[in-house]
């Protein structure tokens, strides 16, 4: 019997009257999968329940932060203790120092770090700092990589490889867009041409070291080192956006996993243990330019707030335990191999990318290595697959171009159930 979403439908109707689009982040509206969203009432471990009582195995994990699973006892107990003392003070606390110390010890390139409240704040602040440090204006980003919703990075490619970017959102002034150059992910040859043309104007390259916002797209062999070499040659900074990959690919993030060191690193998601958080950090000589130590201004009322710091500390302590990342990799591989077999059995052409506990099933015959090949995916097939999986109690990303997240709370039984459901869902997708 198909699940009922009556209460969710009523809530969504009410929400649309008072919240733009009925949601506080666009992907949650489920537009690209052709349905309205269920409203979630609670979660525990690998499961979520909506307001109609439907139960789901959750592979969004709050878009990445819940690497331990929902309501992990260590995080909940730490937060309860913190709440007894207060929520926020607008003053320094030992918790900020503790988490900052943990970050600098974990991430090979980070000598100093500044806490903020979101990944968007982190990347916005890192770009300002890079421009100040280099005394240059232009930024290179990559098509399909998402770094938050601030003006400098809401940019798509222009009509030619070396043209200035143009905004992807109304309200982004063209003079801001003109300082952002959009390149192709995994294309070093194009980057070399860009640097030959305007290298002396480029302040920084910002990149997801493992792309996660066009679906999961790994860096080609030598790509990240090529970025490092180009930045060294032209005195530009290399910024890794590790909001997704930080503490996800390894305890040292993507930079340790791929052994390529950026100048600045942006963080979020996992380091807040499920609470709003962001951070940016890097080499001491660069970070000492941040106010009040230096002239580059950045501030925030709730930056480093006790609750987020507490949840982050508790989460990272769990991730320090032996075997954690091996377990995540094992479970993620078990899921991916099961999905590959289910797709083949259902006669669906699909391409799978997986790195550690991140993966994406693309509905395309092409190997996905950049935005163009990701865009070859059949989004109608994905939508049919998604809806069928949701009906069977499997909660995936409501968009083709997002990651599937595996957590420590997922069990082999969860994965077995997911693979069984996927066979039916792939057959439904094949009819599209």
From Swiss-Prot:
Keywords: Cytoplasm, Isomerase, Porphyrin biosynthesis, Pyridoxal phosphate. The modification N6-(pyridoxal phosphate)lysine is found at residue 269. One of its GO terms (cellular component) is cytoplasm. GO terms for molecular function: glutamate-1-semialdehyde 2,1-aminomutase activity; pyridoxal phosphate binding; transaminase activity. It is found in: Cytoplasm. Its EC number is 5.4.3.8. Its main location: cytoplasm. It catalyses: (S)-4-amino-5-oxopentanoate = 5-aminolevulinate. CDD domains: OAT_like. It holds the Pfam family Aminotran_3. Its cofactor is pyridoxal 5'-phosphate. Belongs to the class-III pyridoxal-phosphate-dependent aminotransferase family. HemL subfamily. NCBIfam families: hemL, PRK00062.1. Homodimer. PANTHER family: GLUTAMATE-1-SEMIALDEHYDE 2,1-AMINOMUTASE (PTHR43713), GLUTAMATE-1-SEMIALDEHYDE 2,1-AMINOMUTASE 1, CHLOROPLASTIC-RELATED (PTHR43713:SF3). This is Glutamate-1-semialdehyde 2,1-aminomutase. It comes from Desulforamulus reducens (strain ATCC BAA-1160 / DSM 100696 / MI-1).
């Amino acid at each position: 019997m198909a699940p009922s979403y009556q209460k969710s439908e009523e809530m969504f109707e009410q929400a649309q009257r008072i919240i733009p689009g009925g949601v506080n982040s666009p992907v949650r509206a489920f537009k690209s999968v052709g349905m309205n969203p269920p409203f979630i009432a609670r979660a525990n471990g690998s499961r979520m329940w909506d307001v109609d009582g439907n139960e789901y195995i959750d592979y969004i994990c709050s878009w990445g932060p819940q690497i331990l699973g929902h309501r992990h006892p260590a995080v909940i107990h730490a937060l309860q203790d913190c709440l007894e003392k207060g929520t926020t003070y607008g003053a320094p606390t030992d918790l900020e120092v503790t988490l900052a110390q943990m970050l600098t010890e974990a991430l090979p390139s980070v000598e100093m770090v500044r806490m903020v409240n979101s990944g968007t704040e982190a990347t916005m602040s890192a770009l300002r700092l890079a421009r100040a440090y280099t005394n240059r204006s232009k930024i290179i980003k990559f098509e399909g990589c998402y770094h938050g919703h601030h003006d400098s990075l809401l940019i798509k490619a222009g009509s030619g490889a070396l043209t200035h970017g143009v905004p992807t959102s109304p309200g982004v002034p063209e003079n801001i867009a003109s300082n952002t150059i959009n390149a192709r992910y995994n294309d070093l040859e194009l980057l070399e041409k860009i640097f030959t043309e305007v290298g002396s104007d480029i302040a920084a390259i910002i990149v997801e070291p493992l792309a996660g916002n066009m679906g999961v797209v790994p860096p080609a062999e030598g790509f990240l080192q090529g970025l490092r070499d180009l930045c060294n040659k032209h005195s530009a900074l290399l910024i890794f956006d590790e909001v997704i990959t930080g503490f996800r690919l390894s305890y040292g993030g993507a930079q340790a996993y791929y052994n390529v060191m950026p100048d600045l690193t942006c963080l979020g998601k996992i380091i807040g243990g499920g609470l709003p958080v962001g951070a940016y950090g890097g080499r001491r000589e660069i970070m000492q330019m941040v106010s009040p130590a230096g002239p580059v201004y950045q501030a925030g009322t709730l930056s480093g707030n006790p609750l987020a710091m507490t949840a982050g500390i508790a989460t990272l302590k769990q991730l320090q335990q032996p075997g954690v990342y091996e377990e995540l990799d094992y479970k993620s591989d078990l899921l991916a191999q099961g999905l590959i077999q289910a797709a083949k059995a259902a006669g669906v052409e699909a391409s799978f990318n997986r790195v550690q506990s991140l993966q994406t099933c693309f509905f395309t015959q092409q190997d996905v290595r950049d935005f163009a090949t990701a865009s070859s995916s059949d989004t109608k097939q994905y939508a049919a697959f998604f809806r069928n999986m949701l009906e069977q109690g499997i909660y995936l990303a409501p968009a083709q171009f997002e990651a599937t997240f595996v957590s420590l709370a997922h069990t082999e039984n969860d994965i077995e159930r997911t693979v069984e459901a996927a066979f039916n869902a792939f057959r439904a997708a094949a009819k599209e």
